[in-house]
Amino acid sequence: MKTKQIKNFKMNDEVYKLRTKVINLIREVKKQYRTLPRIEVRIGEARNHSVLGVARLKDNKIWITKRATDMSQDALRNVVFHEIVHAVTGFEHDEKCPLMKSTLDGYLLNKNECMKYLKKYINNNTSAAILSLQSIG
C-alpha cells in the first residue's frame, strides 16, 4: 500500500507503536460504528512537510505521518478522524467544517467534538448509510 505523498516506514517495533496509536483512535470510532470497515493504516514521512495524513477516498486506506503521531492526542485524533471521513465516505475537504478543513490550524476539536463531526459525515453519506444503522448513541 503506497501513496505519492507519504513514504512508508518499514515495520519495526517503533513503527508498530506509532501505528497502534492510530489504530486505537480508529477503535474509538468502531465503538460507535460497529460496522465500520477495516481501515488499513501505514505510518511514514511526508514528502511535503505540511502533510499530516492522506487517505484514499472510499478505499478504507489511510497514511499518517510520524509528525502527526508525535502531536498531542487531540491533534492526532483530529488528523485520524479527518482521514477516516475521507477513507470511508469519500467526502472531500470542507473549509467550513473544523474536522474536514484542509489544514490543521487554530482550534483543535476534543474527542466528543471530533466524534460529533465524524458522525455528521457518516450519517449524511448514502454509501456509508449502513454504518449509521449500527450507530450507538
Positions of PLM-derived features:
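Short, surface-exposed coil-to-beta transition loops
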Residues: 74-75
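Metalloprotease/metallohydrolase-associated module, dominated by Zn2+-dependent proteases
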Residues: 4, 10-71, 91-137
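Active-site recognition of the HExxH zinc-binding catalytic motif
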Residues: 78-91
